[in-house]
Amino acid sequence: MDPVAVHSCHLLQQLREQRIQGLLCDCMLVVRGVCFKAHKNVLAAFSQYFRSLFQNSSSQKNDVFHLDVTNVSGIGQILDFMYTSRLDLNQDNIQVMLDTAQCLQVQNVLNLCHTFLKSAPAAQLPGLPCAGGFSLQSVALDGTCAVSEHYPPPSLQECPVEGPQAKVPAEVNARAPSANFSRPTEVSKPDAAGGSCPELPCKQPNHYYKLRTLYSKQYYKQTACPSQVPATQQPLTRSASTDLAAADSQPPVEGRPAVLETPEHLPSTFVAPPVRNSGNDSEADPLSEPPAKQMRLKKAMHLKKLNFLKSQQSAECTSHPEPDNGLARREESAAKEDAVERAGSQTAEEKGRGELGPESSREEELPGAPASWEDPSQALQPQKQYACELCGKPFKHPSNLELHKRSHTGEKPFECNICGKHFSQAGNLQTHLRRHSGEKPYICEICGKRFAASGDVQRHIIIHSGEKPHLCDTCGRGFSNFSNLKEHKKTHTADKVFTCDECGKSFNMQRKLVKHRVRHTGERPYSCPACGKCFGGSGDLRRHVRTHTGEKPYSCEVCSKCFTRSAVLRRHKRMHGRADARSPVVLGELSRPIEPSDLDRSQSSDSFSQDVSVTLMPVSVKLPVQPVESSVAGFDGHCSGSYCKLRSMLRPPGMSDQDRLSLEPSKLAKPPELQSQPQAYAYSDVEPSAGVEQPQADGMAVSRSSLATLDNHCTEPLGSRAPSVTYRNSEGQFFSSMTLWGLAMKTLQNEHELEQ
């Protein structure tokens, strides 16, 4: 087997398996609630319609396309053909397949349908509404008009059934004009057309305005009753309507005007006017005028997006340099109608109506003609809006309105076959299924992170820019997307309607209650793939994984420090705010010049009696008595140092924090001579006895008298105290500060021993 063929088969098989499994499918076609997953590349390769649709909607975020087509089987069979190259055609589905292929512009399916029609006799095609007209020539005209630039001419030339015209009864000749009242002479007079069909594609104009006309006729074909089809031809007035009703008794393919407007049947005369030789122009002219009038019907808007109307007038003028009178009139009418559509001029429309002659006015007087025939300016009206009956929101398409109504009714017809969750739209179900399969086709171009939905990528990109356009009205906090803002606003509400069944705790959000219940159950379904540690919430797992990867996505704008959690970053930013608010006060105090009054105030405000309060308990041991010289010597070496330590450790009761801040700089800024010359003070008891041991009671009295003297001396300001020399000469026994502290500790120890 050819390696290229093997390679192609393998590629096609893999694409088909991916479509069946729903993997890597980047679009979804929704037809009457039925979802068809597919690949855009495959659809664009086979369908010119999808190629233009995808190219013109490249900026579209949604990958779900709603096709309002009545028959679902036609879409499904064409998709199967794209992925398998097999198409099952029979007399029952040939009409559906031909209609759908014409709408979607699938050239391969059109070729197969035409081949099937060529091989099948006209009498064996019950699905066709008009056996004579459609089977003989309309197929060729359809193929020529819709896809004339790509369709091979030989297949078009062989479309008519060979030799049926001599055997066609007279009723067939009457039936053909009923469905196609612009071509009665071609069926009844084959000699006028030369008796051969190969000339038809040669003289048939290959302009895109005819394809536009094909879609334009669908609105009329759906709304108009078959019995109300105009029958202006005098020789075929009543028999045509009767035969048409019999022909339309077979079930046609119904359609609605939507994104894709599927016709009930596709006779060629609703596509374009027929082509004749110049032999019978006088008979063909009055009967060829109504199609020019039909071209003023509703236009399919999506064809304008495909640029099919861009250069139709110029191409029409250069295509046939020598047209006959009937063709010239039809082309002139079409050109005038296009000018009216583009410029909105009604004067040109009236002029074109006048050139159509009496047959045009007779056609307008027909009973049952739709309003679009009588009012040519209807095509220029804005597109119809479909408003919701409950909230009044307008929509351009009825299918979008139906989807919107589900938000009011709560209907969720789409169910996940894995977890059973229901959704109101098929696109939401598709995004949900990706979470089960793990497929993440959307990638962030900045960091490379992958997402399952396109909307998640758009919300993620805002994180890199740091933009938070959605602000809370209550607290002013900003959010990158509106959904997070809605969740945040619930935290400000006092209503707590979600209550835990086990502990009775209430919450204002459902997700908080679900997270709280995990604490009761102890369930930890989220495990770390690196270390195996389990967590109760997915957010906890994400934060834990950052400890392995080292990712710190939250950075401070002030110092550029990065953090793994947003809460830590918020606390860090508060530190910058406190420092900025406190720094001016401290710097102002330090920069203020030092005044002498500050020094005096600081000295007078500090009192040793206010700082230290010593309570001594009775002791049962003898206290050691030291001479005055040793006491004074010990005090001179330690008194000033211990006093400075106590002063720095203790604070006066009435001093505030601000006063302390204002005093400390002044202490630091004292002159060197004040700090280098500490004054020494000696303390002793009032009794003049020295060096004599006293009884236990006498020792206790000495200690108490010494403490009383110390307390009296500490009440004096430092500046008014006498020098220590006076105490050295007049006082005898003295207890240093360390001795007093030791005495107090010993007293407490003895008291504890007595209690034991």
Curated annotation (Swiss-Prot):
Residue intervals of the BTB domain: 25-91
C2H2-type zinc finger span: 386-408, 414-436, 442-464, 470-492, 498-520, 526-548, 554-576
A Gene Ontology cellular-component term: nucleoplasm
Designated name of the protein: Zinc finger and BTB domain-containing protein 49
Family per similarity comment: Belongs to the krueppel C2H2-type zinc-finger protein family.
Function in brief: Transcription factor. Inhibits cell proliferation by activating either CDKN1A/p21 transcription or RB1 transcription.
UniProt xrefs under InterPro entries: BTB/POZ_dom, SKP1/BTB/POZ_sf, Znf_C2H2_sf, Znf_C2H2_type, ZnFinger_BTB_dom_contain
Chief site of localization: cytoplasm
Tissue: Widely expressed, with highest levels in white adipose tissue and kidney, intermediate levels in brain, liver and heart, and lowest levels in spleen, brown adipose tissue and muscle.
Compartments, as annotated in UniProt: Cytoplasm; Nucleus
Gene from which this protein is expressed: Zbtb49
UniProt region (Disordered), positions on chain: 176-197, 226-290, 311-379
Residue ranges with Basic and acidic residues bias: 319-341, 348-365
Entry annotated with the keyword Transmembrane helix: no
Keyword Repeat listed: yes
PROSITE patterns with a match to the protein in the record: BTB (PS50097), ZINC_FINGER_C2H2_1 (PS00028), ZINC_FINGER_C2H2_2 (PS50157)
Keywords carried by this UniProt record: Activator, Cell cycle, Cytoplasm, DNA-binding, Metal-binding, Nucleus, Repeat, Transcription, Transcription regulation, Zinc, Zinc-finger
Gene Ontology process terms (BP): negative regulation of cell population proliferation; positive regulation of transcription by RNA polymerase II; regulation of cell cycle
Subunit comment: Interacts with EP300, KAT5/Tip60 and ZBTB17. The interaction with EP300 is direct and leads to synergistic induction of CDKN1A. On the CDKN1A promoter, forms a complex with ZBTB17; this interaction leads to additive CDKN1A transactivation. The interaction with ZBTB17 may block ZBTB17 repressor activity.
